[in-house]
């Protein structure tokens, strides 16, 4: 039977870990499967996240263990250090397009169909807003034998024209709280946030690689604050 959130709802930290794996698999494939350090950075990044979280390494490990029991993630044993992959599409029994929409809803909170189409640009290219709405409707009408509904439309907030959607992977949604303080983000800012998020993830992957190389070679990495050769300690500027 596919994953049933009504029977085993995800915690916010589990949803963040799962959705981060889903995101990075598509947007930063060179860093996937993900190391624990890379995953921690991706979960806590300040761009493309609502809410922004500050998970600890222990919380990420606990979330991974719980998700593994639900068959939604698994550890890839083909690497020297542990790396993780998601199994959401198969575990939840949904098509690729629906998995993309649910991943975005887990990462960014409630969104309109138009916002989802824009935010999905680096994940999957939907032909139009109507196709996004069709998959959202399918998620809402999902039958009980398939695990029940996975998405729900929210009541329109005063002064808004478009309906927003929320996922149900963490259980029922508090529509009042979900509609509080909604402000649209300009498209240019969204693009910049995506680029910053990608750079943060790539930097975390590079740090993990350097750490592993230093361990293999028996080298202690120098702190970033150490003065450069030929420069006096202090402000580090010539002639100071």
Curated annotation (Swiss-Prot):
Stored InterPro entries: DUF480, WH-like_DNA-bd_sf, WH_DNA-bd_sf
Xref: Pfam families: DUF480 (PF04337)
S-S bridge residues: none
Family to which the UniProt record says this protein belongs: Belongs to the UPF0502 family.
HAMAP family for the chain: UPF0502
Protein name as it appears in the record: UPF0502 protein Veis_2102
């Amino acid at each position: 039977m596919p994953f049933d959130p009504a029977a085993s709802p995800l915690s916010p930290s589990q949803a963040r870990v799962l959705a981060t794996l889903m995101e990075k698999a598509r947007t930063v494939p060179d860093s996937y499967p993900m190391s624990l350090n890379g995953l921690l950075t991706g979960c806590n990044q300040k761009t493309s996240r609502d809410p922004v979280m500050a998970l600890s390494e222990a919380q990420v490990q606990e979330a991974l263990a719980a998700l593994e029991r639900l068959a939604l993630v698994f550890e890839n044993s083909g690497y020297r250090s542990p790396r993780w992959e998601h199994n959401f599409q198969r575990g939840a029994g949904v098509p690729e397009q629906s998995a993309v929409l649910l991943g975005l809803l887990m990462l960014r909170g409630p969104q309109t169909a138009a916002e989802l189409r824009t935010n999905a640009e680096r994940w999957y290219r939907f032909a139009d807003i109507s196709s996004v709405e069709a998959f959202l409707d399918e998620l809402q009408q999902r039958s009980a034998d398939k695990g029940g509904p996975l998405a729900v439309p929210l009541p329109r907030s005063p002064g808004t024209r478009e309906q927003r959607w929320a996922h149900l992977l963490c259980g029922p949604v508090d529509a009042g709280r979900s509609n509080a303080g909604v402000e649209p983000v300009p498209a240019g800012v969204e693009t910049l946030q995506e680029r910053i998020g990608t750079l943060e993830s790539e930097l975390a992957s590079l740090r993990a690689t350097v750490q592993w190389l230093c361990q293999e070679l028996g080298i202690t990495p120098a702190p970033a604050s150490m003065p450069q050769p030929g420069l006096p300690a202090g402000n580090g500027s010539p002639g100071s």
